[in-house]
Amino acid sequence: MYILHIEHPVPSFEGWKKAFDSDPVGREKMGVRHYKILRPTDNPNYVMINLEFNTEQEAEALLAAMKVVWGRVEGTIMTNPKSQIVEVVETKDY
């Protein structure tokens, strides 16, 4: 399993969430199996998103699509996106 981790500041969480929910790249069609949106408890205007994929290639394809979207919206609903694709090596639930 692979996770595309994205994080960035947002001027308004509500405005960003509306744009996220519009799903401009078609997350499910691009292979996203599951996602989580996280926010630091001390900063509601910063978001982290973990998108889970079966393959690294799916994660890379979504990241490429997001870079196009970011080029259109950076400075309006978000700024300075950082991203990384990671492989899940081990998980355990307690």
Predicted stretch roles:
Residues L62, V68, I85:
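Extended interaction regions within the primary functional domain
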Residues S12-E14, T55-Q57, V89:
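Residues that cap or initiate secondary-structure elements
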Residues Y2, M30-M48, G71-Y94:
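Glycine-rich beta-strand-turn "strand-cap" elements at beta-sheet edges
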Residues D21-P24, E28, N43, N54, ...:
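Amphipathic alpha-helical interaction segments
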Residues S12-Y35, K67-G71:
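Short amphipathic alpha-helical segments
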Residues Y2-P9, K36-A65:
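Short, well-ordered beta-strand segments in beta-rich or mixed alpha/beta enzyme
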